[in-house]
Swiss-Prot record:
PANTHER family: TRNA DIMETHYLALLYLTRANSFERASE
Quaternary state and interactors: Monomer.
Species annotation: Oenococcus oeni (strain ATCC BAA-331 / PSU-1)
Cofactor: Mg(2+)
UniProt GO MF annotations: ATP binding; tRNA dimethylallyltransferase activity
Name used for this protein in its record: tRNA dimethylallyltransferase
Family that this chain belongs to: Belongs to the IPP transferase family.
Keyword Disulfide bond assigned: no
Length: 257
């Protein structure tokens, strides 16, 4: 096992959808003068803004974000490609004497980036000889956000309702106007529109389906993170919203160590 103190440091903010990851990450990044690496499988796509809950223009102006709007909707982007590209960005951020903040809900992307999971590609030059936490490529502080299940589901439902208020229907129309079975069309918040555009059900049903699929996804995310990242430190979203200093102090201590 290699000494973690000799490795580049990264801070990870993870958790289920609608748990408040992005807001917390921006606060931390501003406090420690850092940059954010988005490890979201769908925020990479231009034009998929509302359904993927991308940071606002104001938030993007406050803190530099990476891996937002880097692909067209008809392009694919694998976990391997993300890990390859993100490791270059981590090196660049670290060279500025900053700690990269990795933020998102894709456990598979995160495992691949950190080196916890081996990708089945014999020619893959970035996979460590041994995979697993003990052979992780970075000295990582993993922070998980969660809250009581009913409160999380309420947050999800409210987010979906805001999506419709902001114009998610137009984004979905633009996406499905393009022919092809793209990876981007599999994103929750968009894939549920397929039946609507096929005249199989109305918009109220689309909203119901997005809420249902988002809740199910959040449950799977929690299971995945808790099973695959035993060293993740968990905090309640409500507690952190009221007192973000708890996390900020933890990150500052990690930065100094």
């Amino acid at each position: 096992m290699s000494d973690p103190h000799l490795k580049e440091k990264v801070v990870v903010i993870a958790g289920p959808t609608a748990s408040g990851k992005s807001d917390l990450a921006i606060k931390i990044a501003q406090m420690i003068d850092s940059e954010i690496i988005s490890e979201d499988a769908f925020q990479i796509y231009r034009g998929l803004d509302i359904g993927t809950a991308k940071p606002s223009k104001d938030d993007l102006a406050k803190v530099k974000h990476h891996f937002i709007d880097i692909k067209e909707v008809d392009e694919s982007y694998s976990a391997y490609e993300f890990a390859r590209d993100a490791r270059i960005v981590i090196n660049q951020i670290s060279s500025k004497k900053k700690i990269p903040l990795i933020v998102g809900g894709s456990g598979f992307f995160l495992q691949t980036l950190l080196g916890d999971r081996r990708i089945s590609d014999k020619d893959n030059p970035i996979v460590p000889k041994k995979a697993g936490i003990e052979n992780r490529l970075y000295n990582a502080l993993l922070i998980g956000l969660n809250t009581e299940r009913s409160q999380l589901y309420d947050r999800i439902n409210q987010r979906v309702e805001r999506m419709f208020e902001k114009g998610i229907v137009k984004e979905a129309e633009n996406l499905f106007r393009q022919q092809g079975n793209f990876q981007s069309k599999k994103a929750i918040g968009y894939r549920e529109f397929a039946g609507y555009f096929a005249n199989q059900y109305d918009l109220s049903e689309v909203e119901t389906l997005i809420k249902r699929d988002s809740r199910r996804y959040a449950k799977r995310q929690l299971t995945y993170f808790k099973n695959q990242f035993p060293d993740m430190r968990w905090f309640d979203t409500k507690q952190i919203t009221e007192n973000p200093k708890l996390i900020i102090d933890l990150v500052k201590k990690f930065n100094q160590f």
